[in-house]
Amino acid sequence: MRDILTLLKTATLTGLLVVNLSACTKITGSAFPDLTSNPAVTGVDVEKIAALESRMRQFVVEGDSMGIATLLVHDGKVASYTQAGVRDLLNGEPITQDSMYRIYSMSKPITGVAMMILHEQGAFSLDDPVSKFIPEFENLEVVKSYDLEGNVELEPLQRQPTIRELMSHTAGFGYGISGADPSNMQFRKKAVLASPDLQSLIDTVATIPLMHQPGTAWAYSVSVDLQGAIVERISGMSLGEFFQSKIFKPLGMVDTAFYVPAEKAERLADVFGYHPVTKNFQALPFAEPAFNILGDISYRKETRGMESGGGGLVSTMADYARFCQMMLNGGQLDGARILSKKTIDLMAKNVLTDSQTIDSTGNLTGTTSQRVGFGLNFGIIMGEASEISGYGDGSYFWGGAASTWFWIDSKNDLFFIGMVQQFPKPPPAVNPDFRKISQQFVYDALTD
């Protein structure tokens, strides 16, 4: 295997060359768009766009990332595209425009759109009880109290959780990716996220008490996988079939799916984990239990489990850009109407109370001085948070477990996507804040 620093520097220079061979590109047409950038796009400063791109490549040079691609689209045009580092470490293959990425929780907004397609068709009301479509949940219980000795007191539901609460992570379900409370501990013990199919997941979740009474708190949860089950039960289609028919095909998202076909396998980027012994990033899989919760990383059709609306998709920069542009356009792209603007606005409207706001990573419950809320399958940046950060008020965002991130800012007519394939270093190590750093450079570059 070639020297890692040589590989990374070569890949970084390759990415720089690709970026500089640029022409202004509009996100339009169903063909794979050329993502190379032209900072002469109106509304951005040329030198500051160059600084943004340099800083994104610096993540690789400094060893904070093995590979990265970032995209800034402003006024429907590519203002910046950067790629650096390796897609395939063993063979020294660099990140390319058509590299495929495990987007994990960036699947959640797509599932939210699927839900709202059905909502527009009149299939459900946001205030319908979840049990209307998942009757297995009619007799859920709730954790009332617990202690460190393992004693748990349960209580009945005061009322059924609603679809709106399911889409805003306030229904009370656990997830198992963190938390020492009884609900999350049972999610891990019963390996909920490793369920072979959605019915098995539902059957297991039905045996686990809620973390809190519906509507009383925000907690990141399995709720988007449950949304996927609702989409299947209402539509009579598998989640993958529904996505393909109602979202991917109309938008020209040709590479987004729950598995990677054999003919595309070489385009799937390595995913990296921080090795506890060697103290560096290594391509997975390796024997580290911390990553087992996420299951198969090859995304081969024959080894994939359930179609997870909460974290199961693989995509490309171009595909996810088309999804974001559709959202920014108010629900349509190139004549394909996916949702109404009214519905897009509803999804991007905060539904949390002041006591339920979350931090900008989407991982903490409780209040924050910076108003970051939650809509329907999106985090929402508003008020003081937007004033401090530079985001337009009402910008919405999310990210994925392997460090991918995006945000959509309708006030400034832009979106930004970052594609990385690595799981963060465990504490006490410090991880780069990709989102915050990119945000600072993006808003510094705006001139309009």
Feature names for model-found ranges:
Residues A50-R57, G76, Y101-I134, E138, ...:
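Active-site SXXK
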Residues S395, A402-F415:
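Short, surface-exposed beta-strand/loop micro-motifs that present aromatic residues
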Residues L140-G390:
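Short, surface-exposed loop or secondary-structure junction motifs
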Residues S22-A23:
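C-terminal motif of bacterial Sec signal peptides marking the signal peptidase cleavage site
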Residues R2-T12:
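Bacterial N-terminal signal peptides that target proteins for export
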Residues S30-A40:
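Acidic/histidine-rich, surface-exposed loop or edge segments in extracytoplasmic proteins
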Residues A40-I103, A123-S125, V142-Y146, P427, ...:
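Short, conserved catalytic-motif segment at the N-terminal edge
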